[in-house]
């Protein structure tokens, strides 16, 4: 996962 999707998956 990238730094963008890291909070979207959280």
Curated annotation (Swiss-Prot):
pH dependence: Optimum pH is 8.0. Active from pH 6.0 to 10.0.
Superkingdom of origin organism: Bacteria
UniProt temperature dependence: Optimum temperature is 40 degrees Celsius. Active at temperatures up to 50 degrees Celsius.
A Gene Ontology cellular-component term: extracellular region
GO terms of biological process kind: carbohydrate catabolic process
Entry EC number(s): 3.2.1.81
Keyword vocabulary terms for this entry: Glycosidase, Hydrolase, Secreted
Chief localisation class: secreted
Catalytic activity line of the entry: Hydrolysis of (1->4)-beta-D-galactosidic linkages in agarose, giving the tetramer as the predominant product
GO molecular function: beta-agarase activity
Major enzyme class: hydrolase
Cellular localization per UniProt: Secreted
Family designation: Belongs to the glycosyl hydrolase 16 family.
Name this protein carries in UniProt: Beta-agarase AgaA34
Organism: Agarivorans albus
């Amino acid at each position: 996962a990238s730094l963008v999707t890291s909070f979207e998956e959280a």
